[in-house]
Amino acid sequence: YVLHGNQTYPGGLIRCGDAPQLLFYKGKLPAEGARMVSVVGTRKSSDYGKKATEQLIRALRPYDPVIVSGLAYGIDIHAHRIALSLGMRTMAVLGSGLGNIYPDVHLKEADAMQEKGAVVSEYFHYESPQPAHFPKRNRIVAGLSAATVVVEAGIKGGAWITASLANDYGREVYAVPGPWSAPTSRGCHQMIASNLASVLDHPEHLARDLNWLEKKPLSAVVIPEFAQPVAQALFRHMAPMHINDLSRVLCMPIARLHGLLLEMELNGW
């Protein structure tokens, strides 16, 4: 578990006034600054909704986000499954304890996502799922991410709660438009009409709005140990340096520095 205020407590969530003081988890919590998107929707998803979910997550894959959802039937579990199939990180927020995965038919997905992502809950280990838990857990789904995408929704339901909470938290909220006569898209259309959500007519618009200009986050860059002294000196200087100046700063002979720089270049630096 992680306590509110701890360094590893999710950054997006800590900025919410009603965030849980204690968060239980299995797996790996995302590092500070990780890109996170919540993907939610109706439990009675259509083929259109499933296809839209897959297209969305596939398009976001190059930006390496964590896909957050609630492990429920319908859009939630489809979002988790697509992320897992693409080797992406995904996080499930439960309305029960970690020792009482609900629905239990999704236990396989809950276990699989712990390799790169996590399963989280504010409830004690064997807490059973209660009707009141699910609207409450939606604040965590909304609070974790920079944006919430509603793929399909009826005129009421949990997706509405999550979208409203995300809006209250000042996060981006999107709704995917659907066939005008489809009951599973009526909620999305109403969210758009009431200005609760922006139209998401192409997945790249989300990446643009969130300023994901580079497709690799900084956290993905690993500096080899041999290159760290040079990299640290350059980062501190924050400008190009002549090799003589770099040699002086590092107290390193120029001949040795030449060899080190050549090795860095051969390794893609």
Which sequence ranges carry the predicted segments?
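Glycine-biased, small-residue-rich flexible motifs in mid-sequence functional cores and linkers
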Residues: 3-269
